[in-house]
Design a protein with these regions (language model features):
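A glycine-/small-polar-enriched, mobile loop at the entrance of the PLP active site in fold-type I
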Residues: 1-9, 13, 18
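Conserved PLP-enzyme active-site core in the AAT-like
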Residues: 20-184
Length: 184
């Protein structure tokens, strides 16, 4: 759809990413971003101050797919190595956490994630690219529920996933075969 293509290109440009994917909802954006790099037996690490819908997705729905979510204090990126193992696939946070409204140190979390060979995926729904561009602070993937602040009035539903283009999936092909190797 050319209209969707223009929408995706504009969101990618606003975030400073190389491309974007429009989704039906913000929950779909989060789900696609996570399921794209995980599978049964894998785990993710998420900052503990999450939007309730994302918390339910990570703690209950993903469990049905055999994916574990480990929670971490958003003020302690130095604790990340203790939660990561060979089956960890990503670190997830929110720029401004909903509903607590704590602001996450994106640079510190991106650095901690990258040191362990993991992408840092961040939900920037509350901040929008007008207030914060997480890619400029090291985030690898940015997700949005465009229903809220980007849409401005909540009369339509939508979501988006933006790829920064800076995570080297091929360097970690053992951890991300679906991103770094051809289909079998």
């Amino acid at each position: 759809n050319p209209t969707t293509g223009v929408y995706e290109a504009r969101i990618a440009a606003m975030e400073g990413g190389i491309g974007a994917l429009a989704t039906a909802t913000g929950a779909a954006a989060v789900t696609y971003a996570v399921l794209n790099v995980t599978g049964a037996g894998d785990n993710i690490v998420a900052l503990s101050t999450l939007y309730g819908g994302t918390f339910a997705l990570f703690m209950h729905t993903l469990k049905q797919f055999g994916i574990e979510c480990r929670l971490i204090d958003p003020d302690r990126p130095e604790d990340l190595p203790g939660l990561v193992d060979e089956r960890t696939r990503l670190v997830f946070g929110e720029t401004i956490c909903n509903p607590k409204l704590n602001v996450v140190d994106i640079d510190a979390w991106a650095e901690a994630s990258h040191a362990l060979g993991l992408p840092f995926i961040i939900d920037s729904t509350v901040a929008t690219p007008y207030l914060c561009r997480p890619i400029e602070h090291g985030a690898d993937v940015v997700v949005h529920s465009t229903t809220k602040y980007m849409g401005g009035h909540g009369t339509s539903m939508g979501g988006a996933i933006v790829d920064a283009g800076n995570f080297d999936w091929a360097a970690h092909a053992d951890r991300f075969p679906m991103m770094a190797t051809p289909d079998a």
